[in-house]
Design a protein with these regions (language model features):
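C-terminal, non-catalytic "cap/extension" segments appended to globular domains
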Residues: 17-28, 46, 140, 169-179, ...
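Active-site-adjacent "gating/activation" loops or surface patches in catalytic cores
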Residues: 65-83, 191-267, 271-276
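Glycine- and acidic
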Residues: 82-97, 134-149, 180-190, 247-260, ...
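Short, glycine/acidic-rich hinge or "gate" loops at secondary-structure transitions
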Residues: 118-125, 166-180, 215-221, 282-288, ...
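Active-site-adjacent bridging/hinge elements
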Residues: 124-129, 133, 175-178, 238-249, ...
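Active-site recognition of the HExxH zinc-binding catalytic motif
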Residues: 127, 257-278, 299, 304, ...
Length: 478
C-alpha cells in the first residue's frame, strides 16, 4: 500500500466529511459530487443544463456588418464582431447580446441562484462553513489562495486603469467602452515559423528549465517519436490540446501552420505534456494526475520564456510592440478578468450563505459595480454592462475560474525564477512537475518557489504587467 499512501492520505484527510450511509445515498441522489473521484465539473446540475438549453434556444438579433449586410448574431460569431475594426459593428454586437441577455435576466438569475444554492447546501451538508472552503478542500487547497488573489489584484487595479487609458490613446478614443476592449491593438506578431525553426527556438527558449526538462522536450518535439500530430488534415478537429493516459508518452494535437501563434501554442501544449510525462515517470497511477490548480503552470511558464527569448532577439520595433501588447492582453484577460469573475462568484455565494435573496437586479448591480471598479475612471459604463455574468458558463463550475489567474501568475513567477536563479530554480520546478498529485498542491508549488497564500508571486505578475506597460508607452513616445 505504500505507493498509494498519498491517495489514501487525502481520502483520510476528508473522512470527517463523510455522512452516514443513508445520508450519503440521499445526497448522491440529489447530485452531490463533493466526494466524486472525477472532476467536479464533469457532472452538470439541472441548473447548468437549463442554463445551456436557454442559451441554445435564444434567438439573437441581427446587426449590420462592416459591408452593410444584415447578419444574425450567434454566440459563436459574437467574439468576431466584438473585435471588429469597425466600432459601430462592435457596439451593435455587444448591445445586441447584452440586451438579449437583459430581456431574459430573471431566468438567468434563477438558474445561477439555483446553482449557487446547491453549492452552499452541499457544503453545509458536509460541515463546511462556506462553499469556497468545500470546493477548494477537495484538492487540499486553502481559501487563502482565492482571498490573496482577489486582494492582491485589487491592490493593483491602478495598473489596469493605466492599460485602459493606454488602449484609449492607441485607438484615438475619447471614451473606452466594453466593446473597445477586444480590438487587437496590433496586427499580431508577423513571423513565418516553419516547424523545424519553431522546434529550435522553443528548445533554446526553454533551456533555463534545466537538463531534464530539455531532454524530455527534445524527445517530444521530434516527430519521429510519435508525440505530435502536427499538421491539419481532413476530418481532424480544429485547435490544439494535449492528452495523456497513464503509461505511454502524452500526445500533443496541433494544427500547425507556420505562424508565431502556432509556435506559442506548441510551447504551451508541451508544458502540459511534460507535466504529465514527468509525473507518470515518478508516480504510481493513483498519484500522477495533477489537479486543475496546477494544470496551467508549466504551459504558461513555457509561453513566458518563449516570449522573453523573442523579445531579447528582435530589432524590429513593430514586432517588439506586438509581442509586448500580446503579453499585456494575456495578463489582462487571464489575471485581471478572471479574478473579477472569481470575486463575483465569491460575492454571490456569500449572498446565499448570509441569506440574501438572489435577484436579477442584485446580480446585475453587483457585476456592474465590479466592472466599474476594475476598469476604472477611464472606462465608460453602458446600460447593460452588468449583464455579462448571464452567459458565462464558468459560474456553474464551482470555483474554477480563479485557477486560470493563479496558473498564469505562477507561470510568470517560475519563469522569472529560472531566468534569474538558474539551475536551483529549474530543479525545484522539475520537482513540482514530478510530484503529480503525491502531495498537497500548495506544497508542490512551493517546491518551485511559489507560495500563492502570500502576495509575492501575484505581485511578480503585476510587476511584469507594469514593466510591459512602461515599455509600450515608451515605444509610443518615440
Amino acid at each position: 500500500l505504500e505507493v498509494h499512501r498519498p491517495y489514501l492520505t487525502n481520502l483520510r484527510r476528508r473522512s470527517s466529511r463523510l455522512l452516514g450511509p443513508e445520508a450519503e445515498r440521499v445526497v448522491a441522489l440529489l447530485g452531490d459530487n463533493l466526494w466524486a473521484e472525477i472532476d467536479l465539473n464533469e457532472i452538470p446540475s439541472t441548473h447548468e443544463d437549463t442554463f445551456g438549453a436557454l442559451l441554445t434556444d435564444l434567438t439573437w438579433p441581427t446587426i449590420t456588418d462592416a459591408e452593410g449586410r444584415q447578419v444574425e448574431l450567434t454566440l459563436a460569431s459574437y467574439p468576431r464582431y466584438r473585435q471588429s475594426p469597425d466600432r459601430d459593428v462592435r457596439r451593435q454586437a455587444v448591445g445586441a447580446v447584452f440586451g438579449t441577455l437583459h430581456d431574459f435576466r430573471n431566468t438567468f438569475a434563477s438558474t445561477l441562484s439555483g446553482q449557487v444554492q446547491l453549492d452552499v447546501d452541499y457544503a453545509r451538508a458536509r460541515g463546511y462553513r462556506t462553499a469556497l472552503e468545500a470546493y477548494l478542500d477537495k484538492d487540499g487547497l486553502d481559501t487563502a489562495v482565492v482571498s490573496n488573489l482577489i486582494d492582491t489584484v485589487n491592490a493593483n487595479l491602478g495598473l489596469l486603469h493605466r492599460y485602459v487609458a493606454l488602449r484609449g490613446r492607441l485607438m484615438g478614443l475619447d471614451e473606452v467602452h466594453l466593446y473597445d476592449l477586444y480590438v487587437p491593438l496590433s496586427e499580431g506578431v508577423e513571423m513565418e515559423v516553419p516547424f523545424p525553426d519553431a522546434r529550435r527556438m522553443i528548445l533554446e527558449a526553454l533551456a533555463p528549465m534545466g537538463e531534464t526538462y530539455q531532454q524530455v522536450l527534445a524527445e517530444g518535439l521530434d516527430p519521429r517519436n510519435g508525440w505530435i500530430d502536427l499538421y491539419p488534415h481532413r476530418d481532424k478537429d480544429s485547435g490544439a490540446f494535449s492528452s495523456s493516459v497513464y503509461g505511454p508518452h502524452p500526445w500533443v494535437f496541433m494544427n500547425y501552420q507556420d505562424t508565431y501563434d502556432d509556435m506559442s501554442t506548441l510551447a504551451h501544449e508541451f508544458g502540459h505534456a511534460l507535466h504529465s510525462h514527468l509525473a507518470m515517470q515518478a508516480q504510481p497511477y493513483s498519484s500522477f494526475r495533477y489537479v486543475m490548480f496546477l494544470a496551467e503552470v508549466a504551459s504558461t511558464a513555457n509561453e513566458m520564456l518563449l516570449s522573453d527569448y523573442l523579445l531579447a532577439r528582435t530589432d524590429d520595433e513593430a514586432q517588439r510592440a506586438a509581442l509586448l501588447v500580446e503579453r499585456l492582453e494575456a495578463i489582462r484577460t487571464t489575471i485581471f478578468r478572471q479574478t473579477m469573475f472569481a470575486e463575483f462568484e465569491r460575492t454571490v455565494h456569500g449572498f446565499v450563505e448570509e441569506g440574501t435573496p438572489i435577484t436579477a437586479d442584485l446580480l446585475e448591480e453587483t457585476y456592474r459595480d465590479l466592472v466599474s471598479r476594475y476598469y476604472g475612471p477611464g472606462y465608460t459604463l453602458d446600460e447593460h454592462d452588468g449583464m455579462e455574468w448571464a452567459y458565462i458558463p464558468h459560474f456553474y463550475y464551482k470555483y474554477y475560474v480563479y485557477s486560470y489567474a493563479t496558473g498564469l501568475a505562477s507561470g510568470i513567477a517560475i519563469a522569472d525564477r529560472v531566468r534569474e536563479l538558474g539551475e536551483p530554480a529549474a530543479q525545484g520546478f522539475t520537482s513540482m512537475l514530478r510530484g503529480g498529485a503525491s502531495a498537497p498542491p500548495l506544497e508542490l508549488l512551493r517546491r518551485a518557489g511559489v507560495d500563492l497564500t502570500k502576495p509575492d508571486a501575484l505581485e511578480a505578475s503585476m510587476r511584469t504587467f507594469e514593466k510591459t506597460l512602461d515599455e509600450v508607452e515608451q515605444l509610443l513616445a518615440e
